[in-house]
């Protein structure tokens, strides 16, 4: 399988998000990379589903709560920026204060 670096990054984020979901199901708090992966995957999949940039910017801030992450993680993540493929092209989506 010949994947571009961007495709490899997308797969890595998707896999990390799957791990994060499993940990949340078990009641395990997420660390920094897992939290970023979960929000990023939400944005990428939302774009593929046809949601707008504005919808994803708002909804992305409600994917995880402070109670679901380890101490200090919420303060470490001020913004998450994700390049996502929408029906009309690739756009940069910024989720401000993604863990509330």
UniProtKB/Swiss-Prot annotation:
GO terms for molecular function: nickel cation binding; urease activity. Its EC number is 3.5.1.5. Pfam families: Urease_gamma (PF00547). GO terms for biological process: urea catabolic process. Gene3D superfamilies: Urease, gamma-like subunit. Its main location: cytoplasm. Keywords: Cytoplasm, Hydrolase, Virulence. InterPro entries: Urease_gamma, Urease_gamma/gamma-beta_su, Urease_gamma_sf, Urease_subunit. It is found in: Cytoplasm. One of its GO terms (cellular component) is cytoplasm. Pathway: Nitrogen metabolism; urea degradation; CO(2) and NH(3) from urea (urease route): step 1/1. It catalyses: urea + 2 H2O + H(+) = hydrogencarbonate + 2 NH4(+). It is an enzyme of class 3 (hydrolase). Belongs to the urease gamma subunit family. Heterotrimer of UreA (gamma), UreB (beta) and UreC (alpha) subunits. Three heterotrimers associate to form the active enzyme. Disruption of the ure1 gene cluster suggests that it protects brucellae during their passage through the stomach. The major route of infection in human brucellosis is oral. NCBIfam families: PRK13241.1, urease_gam. This is Urease subunit gamma 1. It comes from Brucella abortus (strain 2308).
């Amino acid at each position: 399988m010949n994947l571009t670096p961007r495709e490899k990054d997308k797969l890595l984020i998707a896999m990390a998000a799957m791990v994060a979901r499993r940990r949340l199901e078990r009641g395990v708090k997420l660390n920094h990379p897992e939290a970023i992966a979960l929000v990023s995957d939400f944005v990428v999949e939302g774009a593929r589903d046809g949601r707008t940039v504005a919808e994803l910017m708002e909804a992305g801030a409600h994917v995880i709560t402070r109670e679901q992450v380890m101490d200090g993680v919420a303060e470490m993540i001020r913004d998450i920026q994700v390049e996502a493929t929408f029906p009309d092209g690739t756009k940069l989506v910024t989720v401000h204060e993604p863990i509330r």
